[in-house]
Amino acid sequence: MNTVKTVRELRAAVARARGEGKRIGFVPTMGNLHSGHAALVTKAAQRADFVVASVFVNPLQFGANEDLDKYPRTLAADQERLVQAGCNLLFAPTVEEMYPDGMSVQTRVSVPQLSEGLCGASRPGHFEGVATVVNKLFNMVQPDLAVFGEKDYQQLAVIRAMVRDLNMPIQIIGEPTVRAEDGLALSSRNGYLTPEQRTAAPALYRTLQHIAAGIGRGQRDFAALVAEGLAQLSAAGFRPDYLEVRHAVSLRPAMIDDRDLVVIAAAYLGNTRLIDNLYLHVEEKTA
């Protein structure tokens, strides 16, 4: 695996691979990679002949009081993990390489509606930062396909909409969330948790499972199920940011006759914000 740090080197390496008739797969990351990221790269390697990954902690998607400065940067370990997962090329640019004129004058990409609410409500500007950097990376790499984790469910929906609305010839593949044995979704931010918080953390996914089970049994009072879930989270030591049942594609609030739903949540354990979601398909009842 080669590592490049400039757009020029990146484009030259991708052009060589494309010249050999190779299909290009792409996995954008912020580094501090874990098994969940490795699964994304493995999926890309299954679907493409040449896999590009990027490691870039994107300042544009962090709010003023968020964890940009303390977000872990572990490039050497990331390189090892990428090699093992089947990556061919790593793009690890500086902020100056990505935003040469500074971020204040950077053209922005905004995906309306899907970016609002849920994480967008408590992290204003976050999805604009995500859409902008992913758009730039797509233009730099020009992949045939890109793989994203379903753990960041709203982000995946935003990127799918951007690709569709801007007519990008890129196949977007969602990869199921990778979990620890106790159910906690793998996340770079799990490293912030104290041992006690780590023990409590799986309650987030259990709460989603509880709500999904209720819906599966035919309950349609989503507000009552969510109220139960919020009580469960608070009892486990969480400060919930949001917990909602949404339509799985449009992310609008769920309606009684919706078949494809997602139970989606963000909650704080101490200062660490964890997110998770659970998709479910509701079978139509036959008389």
From Swiss-Prot:
GO terms for molecular function: ATP binding; pantoate-beta-alanine ligase activity. (R)-pantoate binds at residues 61, 155. GO terms for biological process: pantothenate biosynthetic process. The active site is at residue 37. SUPFAM superfamilies: Nucleotidylyl transferase. It is found in: Cytoplasm. Beta-alanine binds at residue 61. One of its GO terms (cellular component) is cytosol. Pathway: Cofactor biosynthesis; (R)-pantothenate biosynthesis; (R)-pantothenate from (R)-pantoate and beta-alanine: step 1/1. Keywords: ATP-binding, Cytoplasm, Ligase, Nucleotide-binding, Pantothenate biosynthesis. ATP binds at residues 30-37, 149-152, 178, 186-189. Its EC number is 6.3.2.1. Belongs to the pantothenate synthetase family. Homodimer. This is Pantothenate synthetase.
